[in-house]
């Protein structure tokens, strides 16, 4: 199986438990990251000079964080799309970094799809996981990762299922309610509608990660420039609490539905 993500930390936030579970169960798990996350904000004050606005060394630092997360999750192998540094974090929509010559969103789709197809040819995944058409929350790099992954899947005869990673509206609502009752939570707990979610009626697949939740937390901690972990939750640099359910959620976008309710490989 193969996961296509935009930046270091996305793999742990959205699919960390699933990566850990299938890795532990013996699947060959490949994670492809499209950029180094150079435009990310930085939580530790002592590392702020790594930022794109200063030393511009954050991307290299995040390679190390990603490697540490990979050790925790146990994936088989990792690739950067086109090699480390080929594509740069574009930043959020409408910012100056969108125009960087190596910005992921400025790159030729044809080149990016060919680069991903080259990985497909090597590892021959049966299952591919990426974001939904909105990239989960609208980040330009997430949207481009979706487009590249879906285009590559359409041209690959070996991929039998394509899934989008999503957040369950019901699970998020329950998780936030629990965080509001927990006085240990050091972050601002948002209103339900503040976090992007998917209606549960649209969710096709629910993967139980309860046995791997602590592994997911270990991977989240590895991304220390981007993430602070709290009790049953984490926060990005905005300090907004996000719950970590015991299930990860997916929408089957392509391939047979039979057997896919709780297992990305079910019925294959």
From Swiss-Prot:
Presence of keyword Transmembrane: no
Residues holding Zn(2+): 7, 10, 142
Record note on cofactor: Binds 1 zinc ion per subunit.
Gene Ontology terms for molecular function: N-acetylglucosaminylinositol deacetylase activity; zinc ion binding
InterPro entries, alphabetized: GlcNAc_PI_deacetylase-related, LmbE-like_dom_sf, Mycothiol_biosynthesis_MshB
Recorded catalytic activity of this chain's protein: 1D-myo-inositol 2-acetamido-2-deoxy-alpha-D-glucopyranoside + H2O = 1D-myo-inositol 2-amino-2-deoxy-alpha-D-glucopyranoside + acetate
Cofactor: Zn(2+)
EC code(s) of this entry: 3.5.1.103
Key words, A-Z: Hydrolase, Metal-binding, Zinc
Example of a GO biological process term: mycothiol biosynthetic process
NCBIfam families: mycothiol_MshB
Record-stated family: Belongs to the MshB deacetylase family.
UniProt cross-references to PANTHER family, sorted A to Z: 1D-MYO-INOSITOL 2-ACETAMIDO-2-DEOXY-ALPHA-D-GLUCOPYRANOSIDE DEACETYLASE, N-ACETYLGLUCOSAMINYL-PHOSPHATIDYLINOSITOL DE-N-ACETYLASE-RELATED
Functional description taken from the UniProt entry: Catalyzes the deacetylation of 1D-myo-inositol 2-acetamido-2-deoxy-alpha-D-glucopyranoside (GlcNAc-Ins) in the mycothiol biosynthesis pathway.
Record's protein name: 1D-myo-inositol 2-acetamido-2-deoxy-alpha-D-glucopyranoside deacetylase
Organism, scientific name: Saccharomonospora viridis (strain ATCC 15386 / DSM 43017 / JCM 3036 / CCUG 5913 / NBRC 12207 / NCIMB 9602 / P101)
Lineage: Bacteria, Bacillati, Actinomycetota, Actinomycetes, Pseudonocardiales
Gene name linked to the record: mshB
């Amino acid at each position: 199986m193969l996961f296509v993500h935009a930046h270091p930390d996305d793999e742990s936030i959205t699919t960390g438990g699933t990566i850990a579970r299938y890795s532990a169960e013996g699947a060959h798990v490949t994670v492809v990251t499209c950029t180094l996350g150079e435009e990310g904000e930085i939580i530790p004050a002592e590392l702020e000079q790594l930022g794109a606005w200063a030393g511009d060394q954050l991307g290299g630092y995040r390679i190390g964080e990603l490697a540490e997360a990979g050790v925790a999750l146990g994936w088989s192998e990792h690739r950067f799309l086109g090699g480390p540094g080929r594509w740069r974090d574009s930043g959020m929509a409408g910012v100056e970094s969108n125009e960087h010559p190596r910005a992921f969103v400025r790159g030729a789709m044809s080149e990016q799809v060919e680069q991903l197809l080259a990985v497909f040819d090597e590892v021959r995944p049966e299952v591919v996981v990426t974001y939904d058409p909105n990239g989960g929350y609208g980040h330009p790099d997430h949207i481009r990762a979706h487009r590249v992954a879906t285009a590559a899947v359409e041209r690959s005869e070996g991929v039998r299922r394509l899934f989008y990673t999503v957040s369950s509206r019901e699970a998020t609502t329950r998780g936030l309610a629990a965080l509001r009752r927990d006085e240990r939570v050091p972050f601002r707990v948002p209103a339900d509608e503040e976090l992007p979610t998917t209606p549960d009626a649209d969710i096709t697949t629910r993967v139980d990660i309860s046995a791997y939740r602590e592994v997911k937390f270990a991977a989240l901690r590895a991304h220390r420039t981007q993430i602070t972990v709290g009790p049953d939750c984490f926060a990005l640099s905005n300090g907004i609490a996000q719950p970590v359910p015991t299930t990860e959620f997916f929408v089957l976008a392509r391939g047979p539905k039979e057997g896919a309710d709780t297992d990305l490989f079910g019925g294959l």
